[in-house]
A protein has these predicted regions:
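Mid-to-C-terminal secondary-structure elements
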Residues: 1-61, 134, 267-469, 475
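Membrane-helix entry/capping segments
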Residues: 4, 17-70, 87-90, 132-163, ...
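Interfacial "coupling" helices/loops that link adjacent transmembrane helices in transporter permeases
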Residues: 74-118, 490-530, 536, 590
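Alpha-helical transmembrane segments of integral membrane proteins
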Residues: 48-53, 81-108, 112, 132-259, ...
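Small-residue-rich transmembrane alpha-helices
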Residues: 79, 115-185, 225-228, 526-588
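Hydrophobic transmembrane alpha-helices
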Residues: 65-75, 167-171, 217, 248, ...
Length: 599
């Protein structure tokens, strides 16, 4: 099965569905006209945007949601700070109101202060954003980005940021502004009257803290799952050893029709391999028509048949990945040969050569011959029984598309018995593969001066490029969740510090009446950890529901992984306990004589 891709532009007014229907009709007519070659050929129309971004669209939405969570936590934090400031300045605001300041003027003042704070934060955020985008782009593999994609902060992003800043200023300034507008003049202007911390405002502060903790827990759970998934991916074997292996892709030039004969191509590749093998530092070299992780899918997939099978039995066989490899391929890539033998120099064409031979993967062997020995079986015969390939070896399974995907059914034929172009060369080296890259290129040009060479890189990079999404998403989720935890911890610290400040006199009275430092410590910690417990419970419940949206991003990790959720709960409790302990310890050390005179 050959997979061909074509890019086209639809006429104005033509939908994707209409194009799909027309392509299917064309495929059906071709199948009817040419049943031997087009009987099972189909056509699928996919918008280019979906082709490039379809698999990562959900990831981008999740990242946008994470940004929104961090923004909400920051809003709650700033709102709490402004509420505290408004409470402390309650008498000042009451004096202004008594001197004729209208409620609208007081509200505008509160919103202006919020806008000033948010503007400063927005300016700093844009600067950090510019630096952050540069760092992010530097972490992305060059090969995975389409040529037309540029990641940068353009005018649209800046306008969006400014709009978000204005909305944020309104959100964080609204609650303090309403508090300012509802100042009780009589109570606030009384001699010695304290700025109140009424039960309503205390509940609002508590609600904001609970919200911060809950959102932080959701982000931490997502980051923890991504981290565990990435760790599993890094420890996953692709079926070969990529360390110290260099990859080169070549584009040989054939000028004559005779150049495409198997005999010439076989001799040409043998000369290239022999010349590369002479380069100092090269232990072994091989060629392959389709190296794992280079393309989106195996270059050639097709039907597989066994000698003696009926046509109905052949329909049950899996589609296999066909690859033409040189004799040392399994040695270079260190793909284990489970049974049988590897290819040799005699597995070629011409006098004295072996007849066509093949090596299949363990998974294919177990699928076709679950209770029999595949070695010696003849496969892919012509209708007259000729042209069969004899299975001479069973190799280990190899992942082709990415570390996330399962291994496929692999069928290896000898490169020296195949018409396929072996455009991928791999060389196992004694040290850093890139250290000998230039010498290997010169060796190729000595044999074939007009051969194009590109995609020169270590095979480890090819492997790493398949998990770039997990690496980047995990990094970004980790950064967002870290910021969220710091903000939530700072928020509860601020609230508890204010709690201690407002109740200093009460604490002094308790100490004067015989309360021990442990009692004061318990009082403050209990008040703070109550909010933590409620926020943690809500956050864990929300995480259990929302992390299911990340299922497609995870590898061998459940979206409700108990270990991850347990670690998140422990981390949040530890961080917030420390945030509560600092003001609690200060409260326990209050001098009762000073506290009783505290205003």
């Amino acid at each position: 099965m050959r997979i061909d891709q074509t890019i086209g532009r639809l006429k104005p007014g033509v939908s994707t569905e209409q194009a799909q229907a027309e392509m299917q009709a064309i495929a059906a007519r071709l199948a009817q006209a040419y049943p031997d070659t087009n009987a099972e050929i189909t056509a699928t129309v996919v918008p280019l945007r979906d082709f490039w971004y379809g698999k990562v669209r959900r990831s981008f939405w999740l990242l946008l949601g994470a940004c929104g969570f961090v923004l909400l936590i920051a809003c709650a934090n700033v709102a709490n700070l402004l509420m505290t400031q408004a409470t402390v300045r309650e008498r000042e605001l009451a004096v202004r109101a008594a001197l004729g300041a209208s409620q609208g003027r007081l509200i505008r003042q509160s919103l202006s202060e919020a806008l000033l704070l948010v503007s400063i934060g927005c300016a700093g955020g844009i600067l950090l954003g510019v630096l952050g985008v540069r760092v992010l782009v530097s972490l992305l593999p060059e090969e995975i980005l389409p040529f037309f994609v540029k990641i940068e902060l353009d005018g649209r992003a800046l306008i969006f940021t400014l709009l978000i800043a204005i909305v944020t200023a309104f959100i964080v300034g609204l609650i303090p502004a309403l508090r300012t507008a509802s100042v009780d003049l009589d109570q606030s202007l009384k001699e010695g009257g304290k700025s109140g911390i009424g039960s309503r405002m205390q509940r609002v502060r508590g609600l904001l803290i609970v919200t911060e903790i809950a959102l932080a827990v959701v982000l931490l759970a997502g980051a923890g799952l991504m981290l565990r998934s990435f760790t599993r991916l890094q420890n996953t074997s692709p079926g070969f050893d990529a360390d110290n292996v260099l990859h080169l892709e070549i584009n040989p030039t054939y000028r004559r029709q005779e150049d495409y004969r198997v005999e010439f191509m076989s001799r040409h590749y043998q000369q290239l391999l022999q010349q590369i093998a002479t380069v100092p530092g090269v232990e072994a070299v091989a060629a392959n028509s389709d190296l794992p992780f280079v393309g989106q899918r195996p270059w050639y997939r097709g039907e597989f048949s066994v000698e003696g099978q009926s046509s109905e039995e052949q329909k049950l066989n899996p589609v296999v990945n066909y690859q033409a490899v040189s004799p040392d391929y399994f040695r270079v890539m260190q793909i284990p040969l489970l049974r049988g033998r590897a290819f040799t120099e005699r597995d070629t064409v011409g006098a004295g050569a072996h007849r066509d031979v093949a090596i299949i993967s363990r998974q294919l062997a177990e699928r076709i011959w679950p209770n029999a020995e595949p070695l010696g079986k003849r496969v892919n015969c012509n209708n007259d029984g000729s042209g069969c390939a004899e299975i001479v070896g069973i190799a280990g399974d190899v992942k082709h598309n990415s570390l996330v995907d399962e291994a496929g059914y692999d069928f290896y034929c000898s490169a020296f018995q195949s018409y396929s172009k072996q455009t991928h060369f791999v060389a196992r080296t004694k040290g850093d593969p890139m250290a000998v890259a230039k010498e290997i290129q010169r060796a190729i040009w000595q044999v074939s001066p007009d051969t194009g060479i590109f995609n020169v890189m270590p095979v480890t990079r090819l492997s790493a490029n398949t998990i770039w999404q997990s690496r980047i998403w995990g990094l970004l989720f980790g950064i967002f969740s870290g910021i969220a935890l710091v903000l939530a911890t700072a928020g509860i610290y601020g609230v508890m510090a204010y709690f201690v400040t407002q109740r200093t006199r009460e604490i002094g009275v308790r100490i004067a009446l015989g309360a021990q430092w442990r009692d004061i410590l318990t009082l403050v910690l209990t008040s703070g950890m109550f909010y933590v417990a409620v926020g943690l419970a809500i956050g864990l419940a929300g995480a259990l529901a929302l992390t299911r949206l990340m299922t497609s991003l995870l590898f061998e990790v459940s979206p409700t992984d108990p270990a991850t959720f347990g670690a998140v709960a422990f981390g949040v409790i530890l961080a917030t306990l420390l945030a509560c302990y600092i003001p609690a310890r200060r409260a326990a050390k209050v001098d009762p004589l000073v506290a009783l005179r505290y205003e």
